[in-house]
Amino acid sequence: MQIFVKTLTGKTITLEVEPSDTIENVKAKIQDKEGIPPDQQRLIFAGKQLEDGRTLSDYNIQKESTLHLVLRLRGGAKKRKKKSYTTPKKNKHKRKKVKLAVLKYYKVDENGKISRLRRECPSDECGAGVFMGSHFDRHYCGKCCLTYCFNKPEDK
């Protein structure tokens, strides 16, 4: 019987085969006509790839059926190397926890009276508990940017 093999280029080859012929035999005949090695050939019929060990009758291939020839692609994508960094990774900044840190903002005199060492920001935006930074010539609030300047550096 006669079957047709359509290649990727659109060329159609006619082959004389028997229903009892194996797929390997068909690939060998294609190699004789086209010169494509059988290990690079993939034959497809009715959307299925034909396996080498089976016969044409197993796939119900009858006379004047058309097989599609596709070339086998070997391998896959190139394996990527793992990145190696030359400089070590920076450690994340950890805030130091100081026990009883609030005590540095207050002073207790010999009578037991508590007085503030830092000035508290009077702005409504900041609220209670926000202290102003003490500089040599001014008090400065880091939250709302309120600044009180001294006339003379001695007037702290």
Curated annotation (Swiss-Prot):
Gene3D superfamilies hit by this protein: 6.20.50.150, Phosphatidylinositol 3-kinase Catalytic Subunit, Chain A, domain 1
Site positions (Interacts with activating enzyme): 54, 72
Molecular functions per Gene Ontology: structural constituent of ribosome; zinc ion binding
Annotated zinc fingers (C4-type), start-end: 121-144
Other observations noted: Ubiquitin is encoded by 4 different genes. Uba52 and Rps27a genes code for a single copy of ubiquitin fused to the ribosomal proteins eL40 and eS31, respectively. UBB and UBC genes code for a polyubiquitin precursor with exact head to tail repeats, the number of repeats differ between species and strains.
Sequence similarity: In the N-terminal section; belongs to the ubiquitin family.
Protein name (database record): Ubiquitin-ribosomal protein eS31 fusion protein
Organism: Mus musculus
Gene this protein is translated from: Rps27a
